[in-house]
């Protein structure tokens, strides 16, 4: 697997450590007083303190589900997805899109959920029932 790098802004490092480190369980990497790296499910996430990018007032539709734009996230294994759902629900997470299955019974069937980090950045986590169908139409 090739590691993907994503960098964006957050409002502060304390709440960012709490969300990504404690809540999501991501291992912290290097940091300074203005940025922090996390192992985000095998990928490098670099979070920098600054003005947070505002979400669009216009959402997009995917399989008749309205999804926030922009958003980022990770494709994880089916079982890991449902373990994460249980963990987030036990912590009282408010979902933008509740955990659900899209494209059910069709190629690319996927479990998905959307929620915000503590800076208001929209995240999507999803899992494909058949991972080999990630790019299948």
Task: Annotate each language-model stretch with its function.
Residues 46-47, 53-57, 131-134:
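A short local loop/turn or secondary-structure capping micro-motif enriched for an aromatic residue
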Residues 9-52:
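Core segments of cupin and vicinal oxygen chelate
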Residues 1-14, 71-72, 76, 127-137:
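N-terminal beta-strand motif that seeds the catalytic metal site of vicinal oxygen chelate
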Residues 85-137:
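Vicinal oxygen chelate
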């Amino acid at each position: 697997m090739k590691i993907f790098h994503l960098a964006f802004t957050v409002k502060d490092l304390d709440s960012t450590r709490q969300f990504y480190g404690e809540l999501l369980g991501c291992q912290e990497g290097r940091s300074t007083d203005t940025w922090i790296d996390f192992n985000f499910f095998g990928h490098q996430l670099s979070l920098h303190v600054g003005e947070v990018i505002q979400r669009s007032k216009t959402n997009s539709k995917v399989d008749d589900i309205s999804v926030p734009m922009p958003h980022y996230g990770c494709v994880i294994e089916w079982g890991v997805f449902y373990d994460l759902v249980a963990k987030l629900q036990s912590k009282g997470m408010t979902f933008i899109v509740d955990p659900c299955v899209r494209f059910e019974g069709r190629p690319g069937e996927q479990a998905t959920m959307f929620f915000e980090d503590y800076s208001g950045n929209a995240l999507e986590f999803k899992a494909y029932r058949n991972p080999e169908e990630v790019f299948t139409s």
